[in-house]
């Protein structure tokens, strides 16, 4: 049985590494590359918009624009890119936070027979795209923490709702605090785990399966669903 995947991304962001021999690649090109790899039985819903202004739209209007794509999906993949977040705009005035919020919420609608059907919180995954220089360090950076190698997530680059679902495992987590009050997490620590594009595209099913496994343990995470 195929999976229904919703992809959330900043469609026009061109601050990414060019794919193969292409020039002026955008995040949309990475989405197309992913789509070309997936099983034909899987359905992909793209959260693509043409820059429509959200500032004058109420919550219900935004939901009407997104519901058909998100409601039927069970997995949401966020493509993180250097220009994903427009810092001069509020989160509520950008599409991605709404897409993440509705992916996490349990929402109800009527089926063709008039029966109320409720969707469940989607499995979630973030894929970090390389910047123009092929580096991931704008978000994922290798460092030394507490005398051992670690990887720092620059969560200040994220929307609030995504940031709140990072390092939010409250049950069965493996973390410690060392000098300078650095908190070191080991293993699975976030509902929205992040993976580099180069790893994801070579074995995307593995990372989607891991996201589905986290979904089956929702009670272990403090899920933030509001923008």
Region spans (language model):
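Conserved TIR/SEFIR loop-to-helix hotspot centered on a Trp-containing motif
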Residues: 83-109
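Short secondary-structure capping micro-motifs at structural edges
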Residues: 58-67, 100-115
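Short, compact, well-ordered microdomains
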Residues: 76-82
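Short, flexible/disordered intra-domain loops and linkers
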Residues: 14-25, 86-96, 137-144
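C-terminal interaction surface of TIR/SEFIR-family domains
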Residues: 4-6, 11-17, 130-227
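Conserved N-terminal substructure of TIR/SEFIR domains
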Residues: 1-75, 196-199, 203-227
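Short beta-alpha junction loops
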Residues: 82-83, 107-110, 115-135
């Amino acid at each position: 049985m195929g999976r229904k995947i919703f992809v959330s991304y900043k469609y026009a962001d061109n601050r990414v590494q060019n794919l193969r021999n292409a020039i002026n690649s955008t995040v949309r090109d990475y989405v197309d590359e992913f789509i070309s790899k997936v099983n034909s039985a899987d359905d992909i819903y793209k959260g693509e918009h043409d820059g429509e202004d959200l500032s004058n739209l109420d919550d219900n209007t935004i939901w009407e624009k997104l519901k058909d794509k998100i409601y039927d999906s069970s997995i949401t993949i966020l493509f993180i890119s250097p220009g994903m977040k427009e810092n001069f705009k509020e989160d509520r005035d950008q599409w991605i936070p709404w897409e993440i919020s509705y992916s996490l919420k349990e929402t109800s609608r009527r089926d063709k027979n008039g029966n109320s059907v409720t969707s469940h919180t989607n499995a979630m995954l973030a894929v970090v795209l390389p910047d123009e220089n092929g580096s991931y360090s704008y978000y994922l950076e290798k460092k030394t923490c507490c005398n051992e190698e670690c990887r720092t997530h620059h969560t200040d680059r994220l929307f609030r709702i995504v940031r709140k679902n990072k390092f939010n495992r409250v049950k069965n987590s493996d973390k410690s605090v060392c000098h300078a009050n650095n908190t070191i997490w080991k293993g699975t620590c976030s509902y929205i785990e992040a993976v580099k594009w180069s790893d994801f595209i070579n074995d995307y099913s593995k990372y989607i399966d891991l996201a589905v496994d986290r979904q089956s343990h929702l009670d272990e995470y403090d899920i933030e669903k509001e923008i």
